[in-house]
């Protein structure tokens, strides 16, 4: 696997690639607060399950990617698309916010063959949106120790209780603050919390390829009725929560 950086309007998208150099390219898009490292368990299964290649980005303002001037789904989709080869058909897999980015990409790129989105929160009343916007205006908290910053990253990415705090891949989710009064903070740009008003029906209207939506039966953020009436295939994983790709990567691979 190699690291590839691509510049687009002064924004750098970090990616990791694997698999074959031809055939459909699987694009794995993490959720809010995460990094591409959340796909490690699923990637380990791909050599035996996916004949093409795959690419794992850190979304704008997350992990090792640079910040962006806006985190609207369409802007994120354009930035990620610029980091991908333009001669490959694409299959997009997105978790939570990454699922919205995947749908926005599919609405703009004719070469997207399929979208699999899971754990996508579709119910966004105005107070929720305003709460997220308010969060985006707060400075990132600086912690005196690296271990405390890792704990904050695990909370922000939904990994607390699911991942070993000592695992080396969490380094992608934090960064050291320079200076005499420095410390450690999460790498996520707080501006990423302001991504606008999610509109699943509008995103789906622009997509012409097949779409599968999935959720864990124990996911309190995404209920079965939230996916009702959207006119796409819906899969429910029994016993899984909001992070099925971490809890049971094989269940997600099975959808491919």
PLM regions: where:
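Gly/Ala-rich beta-loop-alpha elbow adjacent to hydrolase catalytic centers
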Residues: 94, 98, 102
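Active-site loop/oxyanion-hole signature of alpha/beta-hydrolase fold enzymes
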Residues: 50-93, 254
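Conserved alpha/beta-hydrolase catalytic His-Asp/Glu region
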Residues: 144-198
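Conserved HGGG/HGGXW glycine-rich cap/lid loop of the alpha/beta-hydrolase fold
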Residues: 16-66
């Amino acid at each position: 696997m190699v690291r590839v950086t691509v510049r687009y309007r002064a924004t750098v998208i970090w990616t990791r690639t694997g698999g074959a150099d031809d055939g459909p390219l699987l694009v794995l898009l993490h959720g809010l607060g995460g990094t591409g490292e959340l796909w490690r368990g699923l990637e380990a299964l791909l050599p035996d399950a996916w004949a093409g290649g795959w690419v794992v980005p850190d979304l704008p303002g997350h992990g090792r990617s640079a910040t962006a001037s806006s985190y609207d789904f369409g802007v994120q989709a354009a930035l990620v698309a610029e980091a991908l080869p333009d001669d490959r058909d694409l299959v997009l897999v997105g978790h939570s916010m990454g699922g919205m980015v995947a749908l926005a990409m599919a609405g703009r790129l004719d070469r997207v063959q399929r979208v699999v989105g899971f754990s996508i929160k579709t119910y966004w009343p105005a107070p929720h949106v305003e709460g997220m916007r308010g969060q985006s205006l707060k400075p990132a908290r600086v912690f005196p120790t690296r271990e405390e910053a890792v704990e904050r990253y695990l909370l922000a990415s939904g990994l607390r209780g699911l991942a070993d705090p000592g695992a080396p891949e969490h380094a992608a989710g934090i960064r050291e603050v320079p200076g005499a009064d420095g410390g450690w903070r999460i790498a996520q740009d707080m501006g990423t919390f302001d991504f606008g008003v999610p509109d699943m029906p509008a995103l789906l209207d622009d997509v012409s390829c097949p779409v599968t939506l999935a959720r864990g039966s124990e996911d309190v953020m995404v209920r079965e009725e939230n996916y009702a009436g959207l006119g796409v295939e819906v899969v429910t994983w029994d016993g899984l929560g909001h992070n099925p790709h971490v809890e049971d990567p094989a269940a997600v691979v099975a959808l491919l």
